[in-house]
Amino acid sequence: MIYVDQAPLQNYLSDWGPESGNRGMNNPQALEGLQRTLETDPKTAHLGTIAACLGYRSHPRPGDPTEGSKEWQEDEAFFLKEALKGDGWWYGKLMADHTALDWRDAIKHSFGSGSGSTTKTLVVASTRSGCFPSAGPLKVVDLANGGTEGGHARGVAVEWGGHWCYWEKPEKFNELVLEFLSE
């Protein structure tokens, strides 16, 4: 199993806050605002998603693509075209489901110590994600390994991309995945 920059919970709760949860989509008010924007101004909503999901936009570094560059423009055109094919109301419902679900117990019971699972798990987090601090996705490793080292799950925090690191650096991502699959 491979998780890519996805924390087991997006919303903030008393035991889960900004150190692990989603940077922006983490409470009912944020969800309501996104849903409204998806219905009334979908282009703006999708441009916000693109900005958060591409590391070179959310956490730019020297040498990264810049606004106006070919890569910036092509990525934006591609993702915006694809996103605008969908219905904003349905995207809003999907995000309501996506943000509210808390997978921590399900991961612990399905893959953790005592579950009997031997499923190998790779968690790819990003230090440049506009969606999650890397600690959120990496919590999956702790849950699957029961808080001990040497379990079936391992995690890595990459610096070469954001939430969509597989898009930004597909060769590096594929190398990471192929190495994991060959273990």
Regions found by a protein language model. Give the residues of each.
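Flexible "cap/lid" loop of the alpha/beta hydrolase fold
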Residues: M1-P42
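Low-complexity, intrinsically disordered short segments enriched for Gly/Pro and polybasic residues
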Residues: A7-Q10, N26-G33, F78, A100, ...
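Active-site-proximal flexible loops/turns
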Residues: Y12, W16, L94, Y166-P170
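Short, flexible/disordered intra-domain loops and linkers
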Residues: S14-G21, D64-T66, C131-K139
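Alpha/beta-hydrolase
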Residues: N22, T37-S129
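Conserved loop-alpha-helix segment in the C-terminal half of the alpha/beta-hydrolase fold
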Residues: S110-G162, W167, K172-N174
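C-terminal alpha-helix
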Residues: L176-E183
